[in-house]
Amino acid sequence: MEKSVLLVGGAGFIGSHIAERLVKDDYRVVVVDDLSTGKIGNIEKLNQYDNFEFEKVDIRDFEQLEKLFEKYRPQIVNHHAAQKSVPYSIDDPIMDESINIKGLLNLIVLSGKYKIESFTFASSGGALSGDIDEGEQSVENDTPQLMSPYAISKYTGEKYIKLYSELYGFKYTILRYANVYGPRQIVDGESGVIPIFMNNILEGKPSTLMAYEDMPKGCIRDYIYVSDVVEANMISVKKPLNTVVNIGTGKEISILDVYHILQEKFETDLEIKKVGPRKGDIRRSVLCINKVSELCGWKPKVDIEEGIYKLKEYYKNPYLNKRKLDINIKV
């Protein structure tokens, strides 16, 4: 059997896909999740495997976390638990800090104490994007705009990991994600526009486009399919990079154009209403992926057209458990 991985936030959208891959590749996987946003249905099929365990624990609870480190003695920590909402971080920065900074520090301290080998951290390429112009891409050493407490907490987390990796001697990889989408992404909370738009289309409801006056097609984003994100995580598990890397496609698209692709795939002409921008939103976020490609050869394989087609096919599955995915499907 491969090494032991403590996968924190492993019942969530991205984490559950990583959990499946790790189990398949014969790692000993311990998913830690408080299920505040993660769903047990995302991982329950993994219970049939001997190399899988689930523990319901809040990362802010140091004592309970330490019991897990003592019990399982993980060699690798993969951290995907977070308060992910930009608007919520503005409304309640103390809560954002308690999860994204205090919770992370609990994991870091225990990682040092129990002498883990490597630490993978899911950061945000979108929230930490530099101030880029049309046609430009944000690189890892750009000065982040830090337009929300969420962005600040993620950036702070990156700095803590780099510092304590040197103090404690573990390797690390910081993955700055573009806008990730794919199966199991929930429509409530900070889920991104694709599942929100898709759910509205399937329910026959109009969608809303938040746009700046000088950007009538909405903000510019970089969308990455979840299977490509899983591959990046597997690289970090097998060979930590000891740096921060962008995980995106490097291809920009407006939010309105994303909606038009959904209209085409789902064969609908439902309207979209325009309103003003949301507080804390970055106007343009497109990630340069040259660094990660040069370091380890990672490149995305799924473009936005194929990714949305895959989503459509996924949600047409007659065996889909709607309760697990928290989305109303009418196909």
Language-model features: where?
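Residue-level recognition of oxygen-bearing side chains
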Residues: 64, 85, 95, 102, ...
